[in-house]
Swiss-Prot record:
Regions of compositional bias (Low complexity) in chain numbering: 19-50
Encoding gene per record: KINUB
Free-text tissue specificity from the UniProt record: Expressed in the basal regions and petioles of immature leaves and in the root elongation zone.
Role: Involved in the control of epidermal-cell morphogenesis in roots and helical growth of roots by promoting microtubule depolymerization and limiting the accumulation of endoplasmic microtubules. Seems to be involved in the control of cell-file rotation (or twisting).
Organism (species): Arabidopsis thaliana (Mouse-ear cress)
Protein name: Kinesin-like protein KIN-UB
Length: 894
């Protein structure tokens, strides 16, 4: 079967109508989505282009209506009657004929003619939901309509014979498989049917009574008893669909030869890993390690639910009897329960009867939950079924009023992190084992080398010892020989001495006495010499110790002297620099004074931008003298300085406006400057000159003057708000934008100027400056918004103001919500305060809820670092009935 798209009435194909021929009443084992062909030509519609708007609510249920072409029976039976519906796809409208002269018009998100192709149906109905599922949101696509209007054809057609006839289930899985990675992501499916209020597993027929389990904390619904099959490719999925379809209950009725007797529910579970960077360990002790420190891995779990509802039927038309009658009752009861729940959600009823049917329990996340939901309602053209068609259309209209709160479900993938760390640990263990083995091999090699060296040394030592022994023995023998010869010689001399003993005895005794005296003298001399040497050594030791102490003292003194010299040199350099600066300042002040005295524009002042920055550091000098600008103002006169603002010389004009800006920083000078006409001159500079320096300093001076309430009123009266808005639109320099934003922020703090600020474009100018993105500019913008919101809140409390906030009127709420949790503390603090003040006015509550501000208020009441803001947020949420109702509806813990 094929369905072709229709754009602006152009026909590309046709749909084969459902056959109404009666056949056997047995359960069909073939695919029930086969619909016979032969459709008449589609009706022409106007070329207007007005669609059903979604009111800017991203979570609203999108509803499309699809018309089935006439089948053979209807072509014969209704040949003399016009179709009960007329489609206007360009306008996204449908006209329902109540009779020949009365029609009703309905708008839908999409209107699909009988010629619309399966591809177009998928792209406008299911593809946005599939893309959301790939991004981490839950999604639901559901088909609703009278039996025989093509729900199963639209949703579950396999397209074996004709690829173009593939239904939403097949095309959705193709996109999901194409948008995921088999390495990091996983896809699993469950295929169920709700038959006679019993949940049965189409993939495992023996599992015919599956229980519904609800998480008491989150309210999530799960079916732990269902079969989950992991999908690796498209062919695997097609085989599962064929298996499930053979187990689905179908029967032959008067309205449809293959009428579904159960609600088919295909659940596709997608788990995707969020890729994040990993940073290596930078510790010096682990410089050689292979560890990396991964951030906590995130896993997004999403679920796509495709629901092929059984068709509603009227018993007298379908001819159901016996068991088929009980089936029809069960189908109609579950569809009725679903309609009641949708009515309750659409009307914001405090009670939604979700537990009236297992179908509503399974679909609680699809209507009023966190899933992105698309509903396709299928209708037939026959006027005989005008009542069923009207009921189906009204069901779709009510479903369009349901708004869901979309939410991404993320969790930390500790299992993946554990596996990754285990792999790294295995690598480190293997590397450690390799290093340990290499170390052991090195130790063994060194031991072998040492043993070889020792053996070689022992061998050499033994050889040397043997040689030394031989040498000693030879020397010993020679010594013995010499001693023997000497002994013989002495014996001979002794014998000769005996003969000459008497003569030699006298000589020997006298010689002995002399030698003895000489020896005693030598011993005395030696002893005295030793004593002298001891004295000299002791004296030398004392002198050495004394010299060492003196050397240490000299070294210490030399170091102190060097430090003093270095310090003196630094001080002399600082004195030189200070003297040069003093001379330069004196020279510049004299130049300015002479220039002011003469008042001649030709004598240009050549000073640089550093003069105001030097003088702004201190208002009074150390010795109690006045600051240079105050002294200059007293000596020259404020009026002459203001006259120089209109000088033709650019340098004089720039330095004059800098002097005025520095004077305006002092509260005592602000009133004098305003009285002397300085404010008018500064506004003239903003209006007349495009020099960025002049505009920046002039805006800064105006910002200083805007701190005074009298000056604020004068700024507004002289068109300062419009002028500041124009400057903000033209300027690109962040510092200029910071000055302009600061001036407007100061004006926002005046209760009397609220309406004028809004009408003159001050708020829009403030919001326009966020394009810069500079933190200082954003901080001033946030401060202005906080001041404005505070004044509005005070005026509302006093009964002076009513109606929505002007900030919301100018579209400031999205930016406020976006930066409510900004990393910069000044921006975050001001935005949190602004949100609290906006929330105090009940008329702003609905816009704040739709804009996402409620979540930020809850966060502020719990996490804000400042106690006063935290308590203000908590008090505001507690006192607002609208916020309390929404918090209860969303189930927020507060």
């Amino acid at each position: 079967m094929a369905m072709a798209s229709s754009r602006n009435g152009a026909v590309r194909g046709s749909m084969r109508p459902v056959s109404g021929a009666n056949s056997s009443n047995l359960r069909s084992s073939s695919f029930k989505s086969r619909i016979p062909s032969s459709a008449p030509a589609p009706r022409r519609s106007s070329s207007a282009s007005i669609g059903a708007a979604d009111n800017g609510v991203p979570g609203r249920v999108r509803v499309a209506v699809r018309l089935r072409p006439r089948n053979a029976d209807e072509s014969v039976a209704d040949a003399d009657f016009a179709d009960c519906v007329e489609l206007q796809p360009e306008l996204k409208r449908l006209k329902l004929r109540k009779n020949n002269w009365d029609t009703e018009t309905y708008e839908f998100d999409e209107v699909l003619t009988e010629a619309a192709s399966q591809k177009r149906v998928y792209e406008v109905v299911a593809k946005p939901v599939v893309e959301s599922v790939l991004e981490g949101y839950n999604g639901t696509v559901m088909a609703y309509g009278q039996t025989g209007t093509g729900k199963t054809f639209t949703l579950g057609r396999l397209g074996d014979e004709d690829t173009a006839a593939r239904g939403i289930m097949v095309r959705s899985m193709e996109d999901i498989i194409g948008g995921t990675s088999l390495d990091t992501d996983s896809i699993s499916v469950s295929y169920l049917q709700l038959y006679m209020e019993t949940i049965q597993d189409l993939l495992d027929p023996t599992n015919d009574n599956i229980a519904i389990v609800e998480d008491p904390r989150t309210g999530d619904v799960s079916l732990p008893g269902a079969t989950h099959v992991e999908i690796r490719n498209q062919q695997n999925f097609l085989e599962l669909l064929q298996l499930g379809e053979t187990h689905r209950v179908a029967a032959n009725t008067k309205l449809n030869t293959e009428s579904s007797r159960s609600h088919a529910i295909l659940m596709v579970h997608v788990k995707r890993s969020v890729v994040e960077n990993e940073f290596p360990v930078s510790n010096e002790m682990e410089s050689s390690s292979h560890f990396v420190r991964p951030s906590k891995p995130l896993v997004r779990r999403s679920k796509l639910v495709l629901v092929d509802l059984a068709g509603s039927e009227r018993v007298h038309k379908s001819g159901s009897e016996g068991h088929m009658l009980e089936e029809a009752k069960s189908i109609n009861l579950s569809l009725s329960a679903l309609g009641k729940c949708i009515n309750a959600i659409a009307e914001n009823s405090p009670h939604v009867p979700l537990r009236d049917s297992k179908l509503t329990r399974l679909l609680r996340d699809s209507f009023g939950g966190t899933a992105r939901t698309s509903l396709i309602v299928t209708i037939g053209p026959s006027p005989r079924h005008r009542g069923e068609t009207t009921s189906t259309i009204l069901f779709g209209q009510r479903a369009m009023k349901v708004e869901n709160m979309l939410k991404i479900k993320e969790e930390f993938d500790y299992k993946s992190l554990s596996k990754k760390l285990e792999v790294q640990l295995d690598k480190v263990i293997a590397e450690n084992e390799r290093q340990l083995k290499a170390f052991d091999d090195d130790v063994e090699r060194i031991n072998r080398q040492a043993q070889n060296r020792i053996s070689e040394v022992e061998k050499n030592f033994a050889e040397a010892l043997e040689k030394e022994k031989l040498k000693c023995q030879m020397e010993y023998m020679e010594s013995v020989k010499k001693l023997e010869e000497k002994l013989i010689s002495n014996q001979r001399n002794h014998e000769n001495g005996k003969r000459n003993g008497e003569v030699n005895g006298v000589v020997t005794a006298s010689e002995f006495t002399r030698l003895k005296e000489s020896l005693e003298n030598e011993m005395k001399l030696r002893k005295s010499a030793e004593e002298e040497v001891s004295k000299v050594k002791s004296q030398s030791t004392l002198k050495t110790r004394s010299g060492e102490g003196e050397d240490a003292g000299i070294t210490r003194l030399q170091k102190l002297l060097e430090d003093e010299a270095l310090q003196k040199k630094k001080l002399e350099e600082e004195v030189t620099i200070l003297r040069s600066q003093l001379v330069q300042l004196t020279f510049e002040a004299d130049q300015m004074r002479r220039c002011l005295d003469r008042g001649a524009p030709g004598n240009s002042y050549s000073g640089t931008d550093s003069l105001p920055s030097r003088h702004s550091q201190a208002r009074e000098s150390v010795n109690g003298q006045k600051a240079p600008f105050a002294t200059l103002c007293e000596q020259v006169g404020l009026q002459k300085i203001l006259q120089l603002l209109e000088s033709d010389d650019a340098n004089i004009r720039i330095h004059a406006v800098k002097v005025v800006a520095n004077l305006a920083a002092e509260e005592a000078n602000q009133e004098k400057i305003v009285e002397a006409g300085g404010l008018t001159s500064l506004l003239m500079l903003l209006r007349s000159y495009e020099d960025e320096t002049v505009r920046r300093v002039a805006a800064g001076a105006i910002a200083n003057l805007a701190m005074n309430e009298v000056s604020q009123q004068l700024i507004v009266d002289q068109g300062g708000i419009s002028l500041l808005s124009l400057t903000a639109a033209d300027a690109e320099d962040p510092q200029t934008l910071r000055m302009v934003a600061g001036a407007i922020a100061n004006l926002c703090g005046n209760d009397k100027l609220q309406a004028r600020l809004w009408s003159d474009g001050g708020i829009k100018a403030l919001l326009g400056m966020v394009r810069c993105g500079h933190p200082d500019v954003l901080a001033q913008v946030a401060r202005g918004i906080a001041n404005f919101a505070k004044c509005e809140s005070r005026a509302t409390t006093q009964g002076v103001k009513s109606g929505r906030s002007l900030l919301i009127e100018d579209g400031a709420l999205p930016w406020i919500v976006q930066h409510a949790n900004d990393e910069a503390a000044p921006i975050r603090r001001h935005i949190e305060l602004a949100l609290c003040h906006l929330a105090q006015h009940e008329v702003n509550a609905k816009e704040m809820i739709s804009g996402g501000a409620l979540w930020e208020l809850v966060r502020i009441s719990k996490e804000c670092s400042r106690e006063d803001i935290r308590s203000l947020a908590h008090r505001t949420l507690s006192s607002s009935p609208v916020f309390r109702s929404e918090i209860r509806r969303l189930g927020i813990q507060f």
